[in-house]
Amino acid sequence: MSKPVRVEPGVKMRDADKMALIPVQIIPTERDQMLRKPSWLKVKLPSSTERIDEIKQAMRSHGLHSVCEEASCPNLPECFNHGTASFMILGDICTRRCPFCDVAHGRPLPPDPEEAEKLGKTIRDMKVKYVVITSVDRDDLRDGGAQHFADCIREIREHSENNIQVEVLVPDFRGRMQVAIDILKGEAPDVFNHNLETVPRLYKAARPGANYQWSLDLLQKYKEVRPDIRTKSGLMVGLGETKEEILEVMKDLRAHDVDMLTIGQYLQPSRHHIPVARYVHPDEFEELRVAGVEMGFSHIASGPLVRSSYHADLQAAGETVR
């Protein structure tokens, strides 16, 4: 029997190395088997990259990370060019191995005790009025990273103008839910976001280590202690789910008092990741948006390129995002 591979702290595992560690086997997709992207998924590149380069340089100079880059988001050029970014705290190595995600897996380094202050100063210098903070999963920390989130929220508000809004996209705090909620109810964001990602039938394949009901409970329990804070979640489609399954998840979210929802197309980061089952037509996204409005979501963004933090400021303001 072979011994498990011991990974040194700080070493990033990606693609085939990362997929080899998950409980469900993912067979690499041959190039000729990959579905061709339809026209509605083509991303327009900006005429100038000056603003993009400025934001990247600001992050590099302070040792900060953006989920836009680490997760290979297709909207990076648009968002960076508009001076917005979603910051990823607690390092760039995740303790989970989700086969849909392009973030590296491994043994993370200890959290940077100066990250919160550096983040606050960077956001102040960027002069943004809406910021999204997310993180890798940190199952190695006693509180799952909740206190670090709280420290970042505090520092952002201390260094920025009073009208800045902060949205957090948190992990599931597996085994540490109440500890995390107790911490974040005191240093609350303006929007508390946690993504369900997919339908419960696909959790074993797409979210190994996560639990559908646990994620729902996290959203509901935070709403119970901070009813004044908007809650939000996100879903990917194109993994093999049915429309009926998505609608059931949407109903579950409303039953757990979730206010806002994003729905977007899953895009395969590499041939080693879980393959795209199908590309969902924009008309179907619109049907889901209409259904969400009828269910009572205060805001729902549904479209092929929609992501949790895509135009998050407009989402929070109630404007249409597709």
Curated annotation (Swiss-Prot):
Required cofactor(s): [4Fe-4S] cluster
UniProt entry keywords in alphabetical sequence: 4Fe-4S, Cytoplasm, Iron, Iron-sulfur, Metal-binding, S-adenosyl-L-methionine, Transferase
SMART domains given in the database record: Elp3
Binding site for [4Fe-4S] cluster 2: 94, 98, 101
Pfam families linked to this entry: LIAS_N, Radical_SAM
Co-factor binding details: Binds 2 [4Fe-4S] clusters per subunit. One cluster is coordinated with 3 cysteines and an exchangeable S-adenosyl-L-methionine.
PANTHER family: LIPOYL SYNTHASE, LIPOYL SYNTHASE, MITOCHONDRIAL
Family: Belongs to the radical SAM superfamily. Lipoyl synthase family.
Name of this chain's protein: Lipoyl synthase
Species whose genome carries this gene: Idiomarina loihiensis (strain ATCC BAA-735 / DSM 15497 / L2-TR)
